[in-house]
């Protein structure tokens, strides 16, 4: 009985930590105006890892054009173990853009998605003609798709 209580406490603490990290995710200049959705289009089982192809839609609610140069699927908690993938996406003011990207991640992490965990996407962006910065956004699953 004690081991069950310990496991439950550890799981609860882990979820609290994930929630806290999600709330305090690093935000750049474009962090408040960029949001994203994803759809899994293909998966390949690689043993302890999974190769996932995502169709990603980014939305820009701001007044400036945003140039996305690289995308990285962030781990839980934001481990940053994923490699940077080139992404040549232009987000016009109040516009959106879709692109497809392939990522390799731990199978355990991928399985968390089906339990409600949201993947986070690290983006290298340039807003207007300004300096390059990095933002991290949570991706929402596109309704009814998977």
Regions found by a protein language model. Give the residues of each.
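Short acidic, flexible loop segments centered on an aromatic residue
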Residues: 63-79
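Bacterial N-terminal signal peptides
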Residues: 11-20
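Solvent-exposed, conformationally flexible loop/turn segments
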Residues: 47-49, 93-96, 130
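Low-complexity, acidic Ser/Thr/Pro/Gly-rich terminal tails and inter-domain linkers that flank the onset
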Residues: 26-48
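Terminal connector regions
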Residues: 107-146
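Short, solvent-exposed, Trp/other aromatic-anchored flexible loops in extracytoplasmic proteins
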Residues: 83-120
């Amino acid at each position: 009985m004690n081991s069950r209580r310990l496991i439950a406490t550890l799981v609860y603490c882990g979820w609290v930590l994930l929630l806290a990290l999600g709330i305090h995710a690093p935000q750049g200049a474009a962090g408040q105006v960029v949001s994203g959705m994803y759809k899994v289009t293909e998966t390949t089982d690689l043993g302890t890892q999974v190769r996932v192809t995502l169709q990603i839609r980014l939305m820009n609610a701001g007044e400036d054009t945003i140039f996305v140069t690289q995308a990285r699927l962030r781990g839980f908690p934001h481990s940053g173990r994923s490699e940077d993938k080139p992404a040549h996406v232009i987000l016009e003011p109040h516009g959106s853009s879709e692109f497809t990207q392939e990522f390799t991640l731990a199978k355990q992490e991928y399985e968390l998605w089906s339990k409600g965990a949201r993947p986070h996407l690290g983006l290298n962006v340039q807003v207007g003609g300004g300096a390059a910065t990095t933002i991290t956004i949570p991706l929402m699953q596109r309704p009814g798709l998977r």
